[in-house]
């Protein structure tokens, strides 16, 4: 015979003594639940750490389970980055966005995702016309839509791939003016111990997908086309023991899409065409010349990385080589070569990365911009001359801290970075940039706070001596990656608020 619960409960309530015991039991149960929640958070942090260690070990062994862009991008950083935000790749530098809790919308082997990002920018901006170069922030407009991203990822047996398209707000035009472009479009196949990608994919050059950088603005390697460079071609990756190798052939750059510029509505920095020219005194005339400049063709890339150590202590030493033909318009054809040596050290959650790069362009000295030591390069719908030969040292230090005690934050990664563009031309002023910042992540939210201090970066301030600003009517009137005639240290604070889905 089953006793009715009410029959048992009523006498007990009449006596009154079990009530304090019940309250005590409820309180003890609540304490146990809270303790279990904390233990679960700690376990999740340990699992993420073990996952990262497993990735490094698989990559070092050349295993096919570590695909060439693992984990897959949901956006990037990194970005980037210019105004970017790309992601982790096969390289050993962590990306600018690691979102462990984001579950994309999935149909069969296809994942649908994207991102929406907003910028707050403040810094050394004096003019009321943000159209003077790609300041992306000024005294007139501090807050703006940064990026809208749609992405499609494929993972079906040995086949994998990615499609990503981006829209950017144009701060130099009235809302809703914008430019947009294809970021990536490639299909890959995994073999037993190697893999192949075909399409618009990331060129395997340097220590990581964004040089050695973790920051929103990247390091200066990006602005000369040697980091996070998306081009059209084939990329093959394989491993042997502690070695990992990449080889690539790229027919062309990723191309120009929708914007106001002649050839620069694109994500990655490339040699481009423009409709501008300069006289022998360096005075620039915008839109007055036939299309002139260069386009990349038949690029060859090699990279080798050796891994030392395992688990929480490891080092990755490598070298990269690159050669590109340049198809001239209005000028004779040219070429470019580049090399880099790079090292990344990991100690628990600390990471120290360094890279030394060298590049040289061989171009026609008789050109419409009348400057043999400059070449037009463009991205983000803006082109401007860059030095044709330079050394590029870059270094970064970062630490990932798992915030298990803070329920609204998964992790924070503070970082310090420095890079320089040491130009061969004696009359040019070198470009330098130092950045301090942090990445903040929770669920689908990813926030970057950056304070960049730079001399010679068109994305960091526009102030000149006195009350002046960058003067784009002259080749030597701008704080840039070319002549850097402004020669002034400026700062830029960026708060980038992104939601990834």
Where would I find each of the regions flagged by the language model?
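Short glycine/proline- and charge-enriched loop/turn segments
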Residues: 130-134, 213-220, 373-376
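Outer-membrane beta-barrel pore domains
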Residues: 87, 309-501
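Outer-membrane beta-barrel transmembrane domain signature of Gram-negative proteins
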Residues: 119-141, 356, 486-490
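Hydrophobic h-region of N-terminal signal peptides that target proteins for export
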Residues: 8-16
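Signature for the C-terminal beta-barrel architecture of outer-membrane proteins
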Residues: 82, 96-101, 129-131, 170-172, ...
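N-terminal periplasmic/intermembrane-space "pro-region" immediately following the signal or transit peptide
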Residues: 16-127, 501
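Sec-dependent signal peptide recognition
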Residues: 1-8
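Outer membrane beta-barrel
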Residues: 99-124, 138-256, 261-262, 306-309, ...
């Amino acid at each position: 015979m089953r006793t009715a619960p009410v029959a048992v409960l009523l006498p007990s309530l009449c006596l009154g003594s079990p009530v304090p015991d019940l309250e005590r039991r409820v309180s003890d149960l609540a304490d146990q639940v809270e303790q279990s929640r904390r233990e679960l958070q700690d376990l999740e942090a340990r699992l993420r750490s073990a996952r990262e260690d497993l990735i490094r070990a698989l990559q070092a062994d050349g295993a096919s389970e570590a695909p060439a862009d693992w984990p897959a991008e949901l956006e990037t950083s990194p970005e980037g980055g210019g105004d970017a935000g790309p992601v982790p790749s096969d390289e050993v530098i962590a990306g600018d966005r690691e979102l462990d809790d984001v579950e994309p919308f999935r149909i069969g082997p296809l994942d649908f995702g994207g991102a929406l990002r907003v910028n707050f920018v403040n810094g050394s901006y004096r003019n009321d016309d943000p159209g003077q170069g790609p300041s992306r922030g000024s005294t007139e407009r501090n807050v703006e839509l940064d990026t809208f991203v749609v992405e499609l990822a494929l993972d079906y047996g040995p086949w994998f791939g990615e499609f990503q398209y981006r829209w950017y707000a144009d701060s130099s035009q009235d809302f809703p003016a914008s430019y947009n472009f294809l970021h990536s479009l490639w299909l890959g196949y995994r073999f037993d111990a190697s893999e192949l990608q075909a399409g618009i994919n990331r060129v395997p050059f340097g220590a990581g997908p964004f040089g050695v950088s973790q920051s929103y603005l990247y390091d200066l390697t990006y602005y000369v086309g040697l980091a996070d460079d998306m081009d059209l071609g084939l990329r093959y990756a394989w491993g042997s023991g502690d070695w990992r190798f990449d080889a690539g052939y790229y027919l062309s750059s990723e191309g120009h899409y929708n914007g106001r510029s002649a050839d620069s509505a694109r994500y990655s920095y490339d040699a481009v065409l423009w409709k501008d020219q300069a006289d022998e005194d360096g005075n620039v005339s915008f839109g007055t010349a036939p299309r002139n400049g260069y386009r990349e063709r038949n690029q060859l890339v090699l990279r080798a990385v050796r891994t030392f150590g395992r688990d929480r202590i490891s080092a990755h030493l490598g070298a990269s080589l690159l050669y590109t033909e340049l198809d001239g318009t209005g000028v004779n054809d040219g070429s470019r070569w580049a090399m880099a040596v790079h090292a990344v050290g990991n100690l628990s959650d600390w990471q120290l990365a360094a890279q030394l790069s060298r590049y040289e362009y061989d171009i026609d000295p008789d050109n419409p911009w009348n400057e043999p030591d400059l070449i037009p390069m463009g991205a983000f719908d803006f082109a401007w001359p860059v030095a044709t030969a330079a050394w590029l040292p870059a270094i970064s230090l970062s630490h990932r801290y798992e915030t298990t005690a803070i329920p609204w934050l998964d992790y924070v990664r503070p970082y310090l970075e420095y890079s320089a563009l040491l130009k061969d031309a004696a009359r040019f002023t070198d470009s330098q940039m130092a950045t301090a910042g942090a990445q903040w992540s929770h669920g689908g939210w990813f926030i970057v706070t950056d304070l960049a201090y730079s001399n010679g970066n068109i994305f960091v301030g526009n102030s000149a001596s006195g009350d002046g600003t960058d003067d784009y009517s002259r080749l030597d009137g701008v704080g840039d990656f070319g002549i850097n005639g402004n020669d002034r240290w400026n700062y830029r604070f960026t708060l980038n608020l992104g939601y990834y889905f």
